[in-house]
Every structure is written in structure tokens, then in C-alpha cells.
């Protein structure tokens, strides 16, 4: 172990850190006030957007005073975390790319978020990141590329699986093929149900190749208890699977072909009989 001839006292180190934090917050406060002056806002309730990009910010003051803030630009700074957005429930677009953010704790307070850019940061924990974003039901556009967590195997499918509402991930549209692959890889139970229905088989709700415990067998309704025109239905333990199976059974197939009874014969066309009906299409719907 190397010996430092001039050790810095612990109290002095803490004082320096506190002093640096205060200086960073003062710089952030000045940047916010400058933006308010530029936009001519006199009341916090009038602030709908803030441009704080490229300000060399390492910390940001609490922005909860801006209740109606909807658009926030903080890209190209030196931020390490997100602790300044606790009551900005109206925020819909947040630009945090090109920083040094290593955790995003605090984003789950933003239920209205629609666009979130986090590329070019230092995010490493993919599970913690997904956990923080799961509650954002309105999130449609997300960017996480150029983060260490992108090196995980099947990273993109993992994000799509846990955030099914996202439509544009890392500047690429989420495709139906990716969604099917995601179900096959991460949701074995639902994939098994889909395959069973597709091939006319019965659904075994207790099937789960990765289950660490023994599941209860699927309950069955007595055969003499009828529902509408169906008898002996399978009751699934998971309500989501029950809804999924029901939606699959409601699929409708429509077949369209020419109604040849309405097509005039060659003789009829030759004689040009009056009252000859024009050819019609015949549509058959199967449920």
C-alpha cells in the first residue's frame, strides 16, 4: 500500500465535495433564470419548456416548481444522475443524451413521458433501467444506444419484452417479427399457448419450462356445466393468459369469391337480354 506523505483530512474532503455541489447548483440556478428571462416568463406556471443543453452542468436544481413543464432539453452536459424531476407529472419529452448518467432513479415519477433519449451515457445495469421505465405506459420513443448495457446479449428484445408500448427503439421501428421473437424467447408460457391454439391443441396452463416451483394444475369445469354453446372449458390460473386465449379465439376469417350464379352466360351476353344482373362478389365470414 502506498503511503501519502500529505494526507487530506476527511473533513476537508467532505467540505470540498459539499462546496463543489453548491457551486454546481448555483450554476444550474443561473442557467434556469437566464432561460426564464430569455423566454420572458414571469410566473412558474407559464413555463412549458426549458433549454438547458450544453451548459456544462453537473447537477440541476429541483424543477418541481414548474408544474406544467412539458419539454426539457438537458443533453450535452455532465450529469451523473436524475434527482431533480420529482413532481413534473406533465413532462412528455426529456432529452438526456450525451451526459455521464450511470443511473436513472427518479424517472418513474414521470407517467406522461412520451419521448426519452438516453443514448451516449454510462448506464450499465439493464435490470435497474427497465425497472425504472416499466411504469411509463405512454413511452413510445426510447434511445439507449452507446451505453454499456447495450452489450448484453439480446438487449433489444429484452427491452421490447419489458416495455411493450415502445414503438421506436434506438432510432429503429419495433417490428412484429421482433415482438414474436420476444414472446418465444422470454415468455415461454404464452408462446406455448399460441402454438397450441394454432395447431388445434388444448392449452395446458401449468406448462412452464423455467418455473422454479411446481405450479397448481389447471382447474377444469365439470363437463355437465355448459357455457353458451361450449362445454368443458379450461380455466387458466393467470388472468392475462385467459384474456389472451379469448382474444385468439375471437379471430375472424373472411373469404371473398365471385358469385358465379350472377355471371351472365355467353348466350345471355350475346342476346343482351334486358334485366341481366351484373356479376356480384360473395363474402363468407368464419369465426
Swiss-Prot record:
- What Pfam families does this protein's entry cite? LRR_9
SUPFAM superfamilies from the UniProt entry: L domain-like (SSF52058)
Q: Where are the LRR repeats?
A: 46-67, 68-89, 90-111, 112-133
The record, for Gene3D superfamilies, names: Ribonuclease Inhibitor (3.80.10.10)
Q: Which InterPro entries match?
A: Leu-rich_rpt, LRC72, LRR_dom_sf
Q: Which PROSITE patterns match?
A: LRR (PS51450)
Statement: the UniProt record of this protein carries the keyword Repeat: yes
Q: Which UniProt keywords apply?
A: Leucine-rich repeat, Repeat
Q: Where is the LRRCT domain?
A: 147-185
Keyword Repeat in the entry? The reply is yes
Name of this protein? Leucine-rich repeat-containing protein 72
From which source organism is this entry? Homo sapiens
Amino acid at each position: 500500500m502506498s503511503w501519502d506523505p500529505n494526507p487530506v483530512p476527511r473533513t476537508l474532503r467532505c467540505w470540498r465535495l459539499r462546496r463543489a455541489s453548491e457551486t454546481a447548483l448555483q450554476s444550474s440556478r443561473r442557467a434556469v433564470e437566464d432561460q426564464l428571462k430569455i423566454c420572458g416568463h414571469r410566473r412558474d406556471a407559464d413555463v412549458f419548456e426549458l433549454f438547458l443543453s450544453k451548459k456544462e452542468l453537473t447537477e440541476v436544481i429541483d424543477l418541481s416548481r414548474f408544474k406544467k413543464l412539458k419539454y426539457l432539453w438537458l443533453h450535452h452536459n455532465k450529469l451523473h444522475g436524475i434527482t431533480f424531476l420529482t413532481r413534473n407529472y406533465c413532462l412528455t419529452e426529456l432529452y438526456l443524451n450525451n451526459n455521464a448518467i450511470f443511473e436513472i432513479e427518479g424517472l418513474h415519477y414521470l407517467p406522461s413521458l412520451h419521448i426519452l433519449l438516453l443514448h451516449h451515457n454510462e448506464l450499465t445495469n439493464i435490470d435497474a433501467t427497465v425497472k425504472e421505465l416499466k411504469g411509463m405506459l405512454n413511452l413510445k420513443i426510447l434511445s439507449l444506444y452507446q451505453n454499456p448495457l447495450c452489450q448484453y446479449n439480446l438487449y433489444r428484445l429484452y427491452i421490447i419484452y419489458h416495455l411493450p408500448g415502445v414503438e421506436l427503439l434506438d432510432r429503429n421501428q419495433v417490428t412484429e417479427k421482433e415482438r414474436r421473437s420476444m414472446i418465444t424467447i422470454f415468455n415461454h408460457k404464452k408462446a406455448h399457448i399460441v402454438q397450441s391454439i394454432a395447431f388445434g391443441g388444448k392449452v395446458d396452463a401449468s406448462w412452464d419450462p423455467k418455473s422454479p416451483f411446481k405450479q397448481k394444475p389447471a382447474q377444469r369445469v365439470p363437463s355437465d356445466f355448459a357455457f353458451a354453446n361450449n362445454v368443458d372449458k379450461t380455466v387458466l390460473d393467470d388472468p392475462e393468459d385467459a384474456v389472451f386465449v379469448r382474444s385468439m379465439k375471437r379471430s375472424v376469417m373472411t373469404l371473398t369469391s365471385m358469385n358465379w350464379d350472377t355471371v351472365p352466360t355467353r348466350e345471355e351476353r350475346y342476346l343482351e337480354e334486358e334485366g341481366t344482373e351484373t356479376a356480384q362478389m360473395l363474402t363468407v365470414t368464419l369465426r
